[in-house]
Amino acid sequence: MSEPNLPAGVERREIGGETRLATRGPPVYGEPTADGWRAWDPGRSKLGGMFELGFETGLSGGETVLYLGAASGTTVSHVADFAGPTYAVEFAPRPARDLVEAAEPRDRLFPLLKDARTPKRYAHVVESDVDAIVQDVATRGQAEVAVRNARFLADDGRLLLAIKARSEDVTVEPETVFEGALDRLRETYEILETQRLDRFHEDHLGVVATPK
């Protein structure tokens, strides 16, 4: 079953006796499957949580995507199931090995063992004017990472960002962290939507933005 805020290729399907968000593709992280569809667990995916909460992501399916903070491939593998070329940036070697494994059966998923804080090191690989940047980087300076990578985003593209407050400063209230991050983002982006992701991810803020 499709919904207005879900891109083509992302549906709600009956899997394991429950109606779940799902994409078509080989499983990656032990998720339940049925008839070629794999359940997308919003508790393990910030973007999955954003879809569950009804964010207007601007995604329709088939987009070119730059994914920052791909980790072991849990979320980006789902993205590559419904998107077009998907560039997955991950710096830590251990999760990057899992990411490469997740990419093997997906000809649209391109792992890059790079640091999202230094986009010039992968600028020669990533296409310009990507349709969307999806970011889940659990380090200090998350807004700065989004600003530095804005160079790749099309004028009408979308930034889909999850800000983890505790990665910025555990001594500061999350709301204060979020406001500071949004102030930095507003220097480069127009903020279209924000919403707390606490239903699935404690002390996280989901952000949808577009270049100014």
Swiss-Prot record:
Top-rank taxon, per record: Archaea
EC annotation from Swiss-Prot or TrEMBL: 2.1.1.-
Residues reported in the UniProt entry to bind S-adenosyl-L-methionine: T74, T75, E90, F91, D115, A116, D136, V137, A138, T139
GO terms, biological process: box C/D sno(s)RNA 3'-end processing; tRNA processing
SMART domains: Fibrillarin
One function term, GO molecular function aspect: histone H2AQ104 methyltransferase activity
Keywords, comma-separated and alphabetical: Methyltransferase, RNA-binding, rRNA processing, Transferase, tRNA processing
SUPFAM superfamilies in UniProt: S-adenosyl-L-methionine-dependent methyltransferases
Positions of region (Disordered): 1-37
Pfam short name (any one): Fibrillarin
Protein family per UniProt: Belongs to the methyltransferase superfamily. Fibrillarin family.
Functional description taken from the UniProt entry: Involved in pre-rRNA and tRNA processing. Utilizes the methyl donor S-adenosyl-L-methionine to catalyze the site-specific 2'-hydroxyl methylation of ribose moieties in rRNA and tRNA. Site specificity is provided by a guide RNA that base pairs with the substrate. Methylation occurs at a characteristic distance from the sequence involved in base pairing with the guide RNA.
Description of how the protein assembles with itself and partners: Interacts with nop5. Component of box C/D small ribonucleoprotein (sRNP) particles that contain rpl7ae, FlpA and nop5, plus a guide RNA.
Name of the featured protein: Fibrillarin-like rRNA/tRNA 2'-O-methyltransferase
Protein source organism: Halorubrum lacusprofundi (strain ATCC 49239 / DSM 5036 / JCM 8891 / ACAM 34)
Lineage: Archaea, Methanobacteriati, Methanobacteriota, Stenosarchaea group, Halobacteria
